[in-house]
Amino acid sequence: MGQPANRSVFLLAPNGSHAPDQGDSQERSEAWVVGMGIVMSLIVLAIVFGNVLVITAIARFERLQTVTNYFITSLACADLVMGLAVVPFGASHILMKMWTFGNFWCEFWTSIDVLCVTASIETLCVIAVDRYFAITSPFKYQSLLTKNKARVVILMVWIVSGLTSFLPIQMHWYRATHQEAINCYAKETCCDFFTNQAYAIASSIVSFYLPLVVMVFVYSRVFQVAQRQLQKIDRSEGRFHAQNLSQVEQDGRSGHGHRRSSKFCLKEHKALKTLGIIMGTFTLCWLPFFIVNIVHVIQDNLIPKEVYILLNWVGYVNSAFNPLIYCRSPDFRIAFQELLCLRRSSLKAYGNGYSNNSNSRSDYAGEHSGCHLGQEKDSELLCEDPPGTEDRQGTVPSDSVDSQGRNCSTNDSLL
């Protein structure tokens, strides 16, 4: 997001003015540059490697090409551009203690920075809304959000992000009017992101606070729905254990179906944990920076510049966390293993929808057993029965179980 008044550089190198030996000071300064260079290089590698792996997996394996994963691809693209075009130049700015790429690239680089941050955060918000509809309206979800609609939503996210970034920056609407900012704008080696209050507040609202409010509301609804589902399962378990033993013996599938339903609903715990990780990481990485971003334009001297830039980099690191958070599913893990040549041929791998043929294409195992990809519901939190088809004994609805007794109503593409 740029660096305001970066006269004292982020994570300052040791100051040798008080050291008795200038040679020792130089060595410490060089060691600092090398150490920070290694750390920043690792951050760049983590961002690029993780997001390239996500994009490649979704593009290569049909099993992963779901509506939700369209949004994951958009998120990974934003994070990948961040790792390729933003973080390396930011690292150079810090390590060299000056900007060496000229005024034009300074503003263009800043625009890309704001674009990627905004697109990444707003895509997270869209994913939250996607999960909300998948959980609250599972049997209408596929008609509510088709792949074409998902493409339109992604396009709108990038348009809004572009309007927030390139337009005001390239038109110089963001510029402050005090003398220090004017001097920086005119200097080729200065790329400190001085902004006026209107732009700082408006961009923070669009890029962070509004998506955060939406995410908090959506995920609170998700937790409410999940809690009701768990209560429903508890009630159905009580009815199940109250059944007459002879009735269970007459219908041997009843007990097996109930156990399958209960096991299926244990996925809620994993999904709730994932939602907590998503919210916690998102908030921890970006909330401190955007608070400081508002405070900084209101009271310039209150927040040290080093703190501002450090928090900005904590936000950058979020781009490396996203692949880990959103790719916890078995489908992604198997895809990653196959891409990295780490997967051994096994029945388990085939059972998860990946073949071991020469061209490494994925063959969804369900196609051979009546559980087609197109018939799946893109939700893993579901414990509800279709309207009007609820089993009084708490079993999985018959229309969601294939001929081999497997549940075909969900997919592990996200949670």
Curated annotation (Swiss-Prot):
The cross-references to CDD domains, in alphabetical order and at most eight, read: 7tmA_Beta2_AR (cd15957)
Asked if Glycoprotein is a keyword of the record, the answer is yes
Q: Which UniProt keywords apply?
A: Cell membrane, Disulfide bond, Endosome, G-protein coupled receptor, Glycoprotein, Golgi apparatus, Hydroxylation, Lipoprotein, Membrane, Palmitate, Phosphoprotein, Receptor, Transducer, Transmembrane, Transmembrane helix, Ubl conjugation
The answer to whether the entry has keyword Cell membrane is: yes
| GO BP: any one term | receptor-mediated endocytosis
Lipidation sites, kind S-palmitoyl cysteine, are 265, 341
| TM region(s), chain numbering | 35-58, 72-95, 107-129, 151-174, 197-220, 275-298, 306-329
Tell me the superkingdom of the source.
Answer: Eukaryota
Per the UniProt annotation, where are the glycans attached?
6, 15
Topological domains, Cytoplasmic: 59-71, 130-150, 221-274, 330-415
The UniProt annotation puts motif PDZ-binding at: 412-415
A Pfam family matched in the record: 7tm_1
* One Gene Ontology term of the molecular function aspect: norepinephrine binding
Membrane-related topology note: Multi-pass membrane protein
**Extracellular membrane side:** 1-34, 96-106, 175-196, 299-305
Disulfide pairings: 106-191, 184-190
Listed under GO cellular component are: early endosome; Golgi apparatus; plasma membrane; receptor complex
Query: Compositional bias (Polar residues) at which positions?
Result: 395-415
Cell compartments where the protein resides: Cell membrane; Early endosome; Golgi apparatus
Q: Main role? A: Beta-adrenergic receptors mediate the catecholamine-induced activation of adenylate cyclase through the action of G proteins. The beta-2-adrenergic receptor binds epinephrine with an approximately 30-fold greater affinity than it does norepinephrine.
Task: Give the quaternary structure.
Answer: Binds NHERF1 and GPRASP1. Interacts with ARRB1 and ARRB2. Interacts with SRC. Interacts with USP20 and USP33. Interacts with VHL; the interaction, which is increased on hydroxylation of ADRB2, ubiquitinates ADRB2 leading to its degradation. Interacts with EGLN3; the interaction hydroxylates ADRB2 facilitating VHL-E3 ligase-mediated ubiquitination. Interacts (via PDZ-binding motif) with SNX27 (via PDZ domain); the interaction is required when endocytosed to prevent degradation in lysosomes and promote recycling to the plasma membrane. Interacts with CNIH4. Interacts with ARRDC3.
Q: What protein name applies here?
A: Beta-2 adrenergic receptor
Q: According to the entry, what is the taxonomic lineage of the organism?
A: Eukaryota, Metazoa, Chordata, Craniata, Vertebrata
Gene behind the chain:
ADRB2
